[in-house]
């Protein structure tokens, strides 16, 4: 018992505890009402768990109830339950007795569902080996199928031989169809009724709807003999009455010979489309097809001219109900039509038939192998209001959500399906649901019942002393009052109870329509939006106006329909701040002096001003330059003339204040260029009325130049430059002289003079020879004379 309670405890904590307050706000007054609110809700049946006004608090999530002090044993929280009634193991390998074959597990179970809670079941399907096969060959015998009839005369033997490789228990039968024997589907002259082919001329059988010719048998030669004896017939329009034949072949179980424990294959062979639904109204037939067997003593369809063609939906119901798998063998021209039919019919396949049915054998074998390689679940029974979802786990082991079919399976492989079932609401009735593999006789039967009641409802104290001395019955921790008494403990009588004391005004509803009047006092309802309070439940904390989707702009508290703003906020929505900080421009002036600060935003009043702080104003004048006349007048005027400057300052919208008691942090510094290159500096501020005030006016003018000092300085500079140049010249000359002297001394030291000879001396006598004078002596005389 302790382990069970511990498991329940963790179950309670883990289930839907994210839903906070949804159960308690539902206003449930009984355990059953609480369960209907949602699957996350539970009821506390513990006595004296809540006070007078809190019966609804008994309904909450399990975790919340535990937190409130409810003991675990008193928490009513029924869960969905699954009871497996029959669960035989799946058959393995070949079975000698086909009646003992089990291909689905489990076979039956009972399911109790808590509304809103999902319950998952696992279903396993395994196709057994060597499963018996019943094949019924349904052939179109209209005139266009004459060559096909000749081709299949030996089909029985060939088909039995091939199928023996796949199963040791094979039977086959034969039936044929043409069309409803009534105008306008056939010609109605006596000659053409007797012989529809008389215009060719050729003899053929009269038009007929459906004939069951050979019941299912394992005698292949008998099948061949029957086929050889068949004759064709004819009709007018191209579509045939094949769907009439399919319906009769599916529902006439005894006459066809379908076995309960075999695979039912219905091979439909035709080269034309089929009539269905209301096509027979052309012939005046208006009675809907009843889906019953109507084969007469001659095994012919007796209601062909009375009942309409079956609809696709009717065919689906009967084929699934009788586990018949349909194989459409049709010509290439008709394939696209029958593929559309096959998409709607569970287990149906389509094969392309050659003109003369030459490939019919291979077509049947291929279709059989395809059907045996697929496992698909079909849902039957009362599923209205029931939510079902499937997840297929095929031989690869990979789950495929929202799929109830496995393909490419081998015989003997196990296909698993997780089936999730849920009920959206509580309906006081049980449902019978069947899950079956398409084409197989095995099925899982499920009895689904709603779980909407509490165990504590079984224990009732009638006329309990806990309910004001027997004025009611005590059940699940609360009182159910007898007639004439009301109140949570049945303490008030209806004859003495008046609701007038619960009305704020005579014309208003009791407790403002948001509470219940118990013994002359209002007990306000719980609301998921907030608290309802007041002596008449007239107040709440959630009905105030909203700003940008937030209650009281998220800057105040809602009290009885009105916003109570927090500090720093005002307005009906508490969306208006009292702070002016957002309105101060970069120069420190409120709205740049061009507007008013309202709710933390600047409303520009100067024409042309814009921007968050009215800082942009192409048409506005410079605030500093606009005060030039006022400032210059103030600086140039003497004591009496300053009064004349007041008017100029008024025109500029400013006043001059020589006092120093102002905040320099919020001031604007201005500089103006005046006459004689004087620089005027002053500060601008705004007073409480928004007017401009001028402070700290200063004028700084440059001094005139000192000409004598400038001339003296220039003269001294010229003199100094001259002296410097002379010094430089002297240095250069001295450097050159020293260089020459050094060179001379070096040359002198290298010379080697002869004794008594001055190397620097040059004689004063020079001798020249006259080349034209030939007398040598005279030359000598001349030379000596010269010397």
Swiss-Prot record:
Primary site of residence: membrane
Sequence intervals crossing the membrane: 709-729
Biological-process GO terms, alphabetical: cell adhesion mediated by integrin; cell migration; cell-cell adhesion; cell-matrix adhesion; integrin-mediated signaling pathway
Region ranges (Interaction with HAX1): 730-757
Cytoplasmic compartment segments: 730-787
Membrane topology label: Single-pass type I membrane protein
Keywords of the record: Calcium, Cell adhesion, Cell junction, Cell membrane, Disulfide bond, EGF-like domain, Glycoprotein, Host cell receptor for virus entry, Host-virus interaction, Integrin, Magnesium, Membrane, Metal-binding, Receptor, Repeat, Signal, Transmembrane, Transmembrane helix
Gene3D superfamilies assigned to the protein according to its UniProt record, in alphabetical order: 4.10.1240.30, Cytochrome c1, transmembrane anchor, C-terminal (1.20.5.100), Laminin (2.10.25.10), ligand-binding face of the semaphorins, domain 2 (3.30.1680.10), ntegrin, alpha v. Chain A, domain 3 (2.60.40.1510), von Willebrand factor, type A domain (3.40.50.410)
Cystine bridges: 23-41, 31-454, 34-59, 44-70, 197-204, 252-293, 394-406, 426-452, 456-476, 467-479, 481-490, 492-519, 502-517, 511-522, 524-537, 539-560, 544-558, 552-563, 565-574, 576-599, 583-597, 591-602, 604-614, 617-620, 624-670, 630-649, 633-645, 678-701
Domain VWFA residues, every copy: 131-371
Residue ranges occupied by any I-EGF domain in the UniProt entry: 456-491, 492-538, 539-575, 576-615
PSI domain span: 22-71
Glycosylation sites (chain numbering): 48, 97, 260, 387, 418, 463, 471, 541, 575
GO cellular component annotations of the record: cell surface; focal adhesion; integrin alphav-beta6 complex
Binding-site residues, Ca(2+) 1: 144, 147-148, 271, 355
Signal peptide: 1-21
A GO term, aspect molecular function: metal ion binding
Residue numbers binding Mg(2+): 140, 142, 144, 240
Binding site for Ca(2+) 2: 179, 235, 237, 239-240
Record localization: Cell membrane; Cell junction, Focal adhesion
Family of the protein in this entry: Belongs to the integrin beta chain family.
Subunit structure comment from the entry: Heterodimer of an alpha and a beta subunit. Interacts with FLNB. Interacts with HAX1. ITGAV:ITGB6 interacts with FBN1. ITGAV:ITGB6 interacts with TGFB1.
Record's function text: Integrin alpha-V:beta-6 (ITGAV:ITGB6) is a receptor for fibronectin and cytotactin. It recognizes the sequence R-G-D in its ligands. ITGAV:ITGB6 acts as a receptor for fibrillin-1 (FBN1) and mediates R-G-D-dependent cell adhesion to FBN1. Integrin alpha-V:beta-6 (ITGAV:ITGB6) mediates R-G-D-dependent release of transforming growth factor beta-1 (TGF-beta-1) from regulatory Latency-associated peptide (LAP), thereby playing a key role in TGF-beta-1 activation.
The protein's name: Integrin beta-6
Lineage, opening ranks: Eukaryota, Metazoa, Chordata, Craniata, Vertebrata
